[in-house]
A protein has these predicted regions:
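Bacterial N-terminal signal peptides
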Residues: 4-15
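Sec-exported extracytoplasmic/periplasmic mature domains
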Residues: 53, 86, 98-102, 141-148
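C-terminal capping alpha-helices of c-type cytochrome domains
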Residues: 91, 95-96, 112-149
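Domain-scale selection of a single, long terminal region
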Residues: 1-6, 28-29
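Short pre-active-site segment immediately N-terminal to redox-active cysteine/selenocysteine motifs
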Residues: 55-59, 135
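Gly/Gly-Pro-rich "capping" loops immediately C-terminal to redox-active cysteine motifs
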Residues: 41-42, 51, 61, 65-99, ...
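Electrostatic cytochrome c docking/interface patches
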Residues: 22-55
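Sec/Tat signal peptide C-region and signal peptidase I cleavage site
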Residues: 16-20
Length: 149
C-alpha cells in the first residue's frame, strides 16, 4: 500500500495540470464505459502516443509497459498497453482514463479527468484535471489502435 501511495504521489508531482480555464465537460457513464467523446470529435492517435510516452505529462510508462522500443525503464505495476485496443472499446478506455476508480476503487491509476473527491492533491492541481478533454481523447484514440497481432 505504501508503494501505491508513492506511485500516485509521484504521478501527481511530475505531471503538469490541464489548463485552469477549461471547464470539466459533462459525460455519461454507461456500464463500464463512457461511449461518447468528451470533446465531440475523435482524438489524434499521434498526439496520444506522445502523451503516453511523455514522462512529464501522461506518465503512463511509470506503471505500464507498451510498444515503445525507444523508451527505457517501462513500468511493471499495471497491465501492458500492448493490445489495449483489442481488450477494451474506446468507451471503456475513456472511462479508465477519466476515472479508473469507478471500475476499481483500489486502483493506483490516477483519475486524469476528475477534480472532485480526490485525496492528497498538490496545490498546483487543485481544481484542475491532469489532462484536458482533448488530451484524454488523443490517448484514447492512440490506445484504440493498439490491437493484438
Amino acid at each position: 500500500m505504501r508503494l501505491c501511495a508513492l506511485v500516485v504521489t509521484a504521478l501527481l508531482g511530475l505531471t503538469a495540470p490541464a489548463q485552469a480555464d477549461e471547464e470539466l465537460r459533462p459525460f455519461m457513464i454507461l456500464g463500464d464505459a463512457i461511449p461518447e467523446s468528451l470533446t465531440g470529435t475523435p482524438g489524434d492517435p499521434a498526439k496520444g502516443r506522445a502523451i503516453v510516452a511523455n514522462r512529464q505529462l501522461g506518465l503512463c510508462l511509470l506503471c505500464h509497459t507498451g510498444p515503445f522500443p525507444e523508451e527505457r525503464f517501462q513500468g511493471t505495476l499495471s497491465p501492458s498497453l500492448a493490445g489495449a485496443g483489442s481488450r477494451w472499446s474506446a468507451g471503456q478506455l475513456r472511462l479508465r482514463m477519466v476515472d479508473a476508480q469507478r471500475l476499481n476503487p483500489d486502483t493506483i491509476m490516477p483519475a486524469y479527468y476528475r477534480i472532485g473527491g480526490l485525496r492528497r492533491v498538490a496545490r498546483a492541481f487543485e481544481g484542475k484535471t491532469l489532462l484536458s478533454a482533448g488530451q484524454v481523447e488523443d490517448v484514447v484514440a492512440y490506445l484504440a489502435t493498439l490491437k493484438d497481432p
